Structure formats: C-alpha cells, structure tokens
C-alpha cells in the first residue's frame, strides 16, 4: 500500500498548506522521498482478485506538519521516539514489505466460525428433531385426511380436523356439495306438507306479519326463483372455481353466513307463547349440527331399520305439527340455493380475499344478469345485517363439523353396502 501526495505547488510547498489525497496500492511501496509516486499494477490486482486494506494518510508540507498539535485529527499520537526518516532505505523497504505481507495474509485467510463441541452437538440434535417433527406431522395429517375421506373410523380417539389452508379445494367442494344437497333434498321433500313463510305468501295466503318479519321478507323473496336451475351444485361449484377461483375460507364462509341468516330470519317469525320454549333451542342450532346429529342417529340405528323408520315418522310428524304453528321464513331449497351461493361468494370474496373479480364476471359465471347480482349482493348484506367478520375459531369449528359430516356420510354408505 502506498500513497501519493502532492501540494498545489511543488516548488513552494511551505507557502500553501493545502494538500491533496491520492491512494494507490502496490505490492512494493517506496517511501524514500517527500513526493511519492508509485503507480498501481492493475493487471496484477485483477489476477490476484483480492482486496487491499485502504489506509487514508494525509501528506502535507513540513511546515503544516510542524504547526499541527501533538495529537492528530484521528486521535492518534505519533511516536516521538521513532523517526521513520532516520532509518536506512533497506530497513524501510523491509519493514514496508513485512507490514504489507502480514496484512494481505490476514485478508486472504478464511477462518470459519468454530462452535464448541457441545453447541455443535446441540445444533445437530435440534435440526434432526425439527426434521423428524416436520416429517411426522406431514405424514400424519395426510394420512388422517385420507382416512377420513375414505370413511375410516377405526381410530375413534382421533378427532376429525380440517386444515383450511392446505386442504385440497376440490375435495372441500365435494364435501360442501354433499352437505348442501342433503339439506336441499330434505327441505324439498317437506315443502308440500310444511311450506315456509315465503312459500305461503307466494301461494296467495295473507298472513299477519310483524315489523321484523317484513324487514327480512323482501330480501328472502329476492333469492327465490320461479324455476329450478338444471345445473347441479357440484357442477355449479366447479364452474365457479374454474372461472372465478378462490380459497377454501371463502367456500367455508358460506356455511357461516347461511346459518347466520337462518337464525336471524327464523327467530323473528311469529311463535305461539306455549311453543316458545320448545322451539328456542332448535332455532339456535346450526344446520351442520342438525345434519351431524341426524347422521349419528342414522348410523346408530342402522341395525334396526324398523325402529329407524318409526322414529323418523314420529319425528316428521312432530316437525309438521310444530312447523304449522311456526312457519320458517328462510329455507334453503332448489329454488334459491344457486342465487345464495353466487351472491355469498361475491360478498365473501370481496371481504375475505385480497383478489376478487368484477360483478359482471360473477354474474356471467353464475348465470344471472348484472342488475340481479347487484340487487342480490345488497340483499345478502341486509340478511347478514352487514356482519361479515368471521373469527378463526368459528371458521375452524364449521370446517371440523363439515369434516365430521363427511366422515359420518362415508361410514353410513359403507354400512349400507355391507348390509346389502
């Protein structure tokens, strides 16, 4: 490392205290004269491909150095006992080469960080443990999902749990389709003997409605179509996922919103005082709980078909007697389920997802006009009372209930096949 310093006037250095800075590097440095001029060997520097320690040194005139204090601007006191100029030329060259060589050796050497043996052993053990835990967790979750999807209930201690983030969307749509299809078929069968409040109004019956009933009657009637769409729910969900793809939480939120609408609309209907306590608990029960409760009852009574038929007849009779006195306002059936799904996905995607499509795209995919979708979107918000926030625990609870329903349905189908 060598330094080139020149004053503005080389002939009269003492008259001008200003000095310039010039830094150059070379393997051989010569500090013999006041004005040092050593050029850098760029080819050698590029071939070695190494970095030099750059030391900035101020070269000034003798008068400027004498006028400075004993302490420099960097805070380093010069050694008064050693005079570099007094040394011989050979000694100066040897000292410069020794310092330069030691600096370059320090730079070129690579010293890896060494941990103590205990730390290395602990680090390796921790990495191995993390790999084992991650591998075990992945295998167990995939195995558990496959077992539940296949209807395997041999391990009763394992509680069915659905991983919302990693669960395949196509499998989730199959489960969601199975649940909604069961609810719709059940409501369609009881529509003739147990019509809902909206169906009675459509049939021309004039009923005395309260203010709360009138508040939700118009939004509920907006989703009811005159004709049943020919497309099934499985194809409808696949069409939505193909042209307007979204995440699992959006599809699961449909169950949450449908249950909220059902509880809110059916709780405001006129109920006789004698039957208020009797209908209080079922109105607060979700459709998933009812489906799972019915599935558990059917699986438990599968060995005795006669008792099952008698219980179902008694239950249907009781439901008919109670429902005549307490008609429900919001009932999901084949006439309104498609509009509820496309409106719910439109609202849920805009609220839960960072990416969503325009209403014109949703309307074309859903098979309705843009004006109708805009109207249904507003009516859906009114039915939800503009409460769209869903907590993580609530969404996970509905996902687990859906998982449990799918598990029970698979077990029932396998039991029926075995019994035949």
Swiss-Prot record:
Coiled coil: none
Modified residue annotations for Phosphothreonine: 317
Subcellular locations according to the entry: Cytoplasm; Nucleus
CDD domains linked to this entry: CYCLIN_ScPCL7-like
Region feature (Disordered): 1-82, 134-155, 268-321
Modified residues (Phosphoserine): 61, 281, 312
One of the record's GO cellular component terms: nucleus
Disulfide bonds: none
One Gene Ontology molecular-function label: protein kinase binding
Protein name from the UniProt record: PHO85 cyclin-6
Species classification: Eukaryota, Fungi, Dikarya, Ascomycota, Saccharomycotina
């Amino acid at each position: 490392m060598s330094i080139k310093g020149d004053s503005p006037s080389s002939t009269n250095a003492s008259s001008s205290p200003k000095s310039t800075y010039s830094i150059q590097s070379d393997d051989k440095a010569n500090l013999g004269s006041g004005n040092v001029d050593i050029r850098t060997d760029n080819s050698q520097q590029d071939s070695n491909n190494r970095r030099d320690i750059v030391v900035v040194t101020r070269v000034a005139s003798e008068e400027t150095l004498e006028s400075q204090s004993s302490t420099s601007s960097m805070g380093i006191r010069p050694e008064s006992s050693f005079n570099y100029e007094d040394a011989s030329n050979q000694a100066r060259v040897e000292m410069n080469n020794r310092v330069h060589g030691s600096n370059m050796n320090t730079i070129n050497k690579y010293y890896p960080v060494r941990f103590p043996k205990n730390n290395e052993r602990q680090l390796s053990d921790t990495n191995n443990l993390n790999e084992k835990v991650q591998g075990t967790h992945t295998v167990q979750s995939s195995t558990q999902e496959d077992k539940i999807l296949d209807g395997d209930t041999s391990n009763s201690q394992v509680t069915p749990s659905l991983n919302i983030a990693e669960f395949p969307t196509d499998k989730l749509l199959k489960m969601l389709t199975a649940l909604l299809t069961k609810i719709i078929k059940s409501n369609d069968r009881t529509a003739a003997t147990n019509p809902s409040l909206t169906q009675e109004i459509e049939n021309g019956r004039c009923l005395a409605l309260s203010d709360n009933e009138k508040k939700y009657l118009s939004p509920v009637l907006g989703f009811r179509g005159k004709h049943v769409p020919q497309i099934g729910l499985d194809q409808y969900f696949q069409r939505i996922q193909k042209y307007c793809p979204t995440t699992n939480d959006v599809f699961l939120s449909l169950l949450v919103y449908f249950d909220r609408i059902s509880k809110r609309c059916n709780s405001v209907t006129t109920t006789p005082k004698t039957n208020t306590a009797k209908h209080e608990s079922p109105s607060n029960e979700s459709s998933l709980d009812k489906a799972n409760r019915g599935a558990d009852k059917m699986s438990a009574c599968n060995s005795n078909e006669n008792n099952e038929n008698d219980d179902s007849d008694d239950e249907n009779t009781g439901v008919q007697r109670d429902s005549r006195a307490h008609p429900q306002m919001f009932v999901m059936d084949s006439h309104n389920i498609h509009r509820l799904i496309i409106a719910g996905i439109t609202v849920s995607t805009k609220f839960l997802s960072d990416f969503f499509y325009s209403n014109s795209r949703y309307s074309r995919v859903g098979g309705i006009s843009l004006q109708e979708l805009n109207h249904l979107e507003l009516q859906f918000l009114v039915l939800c009372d503009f409460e769209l926030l869903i907590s993580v625990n609530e969404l996970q609870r509905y996902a687990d209930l859906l998982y449990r329903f799918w598990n029970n349905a698979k077990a029932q189908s396998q039991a029926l096949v075995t019994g035949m």
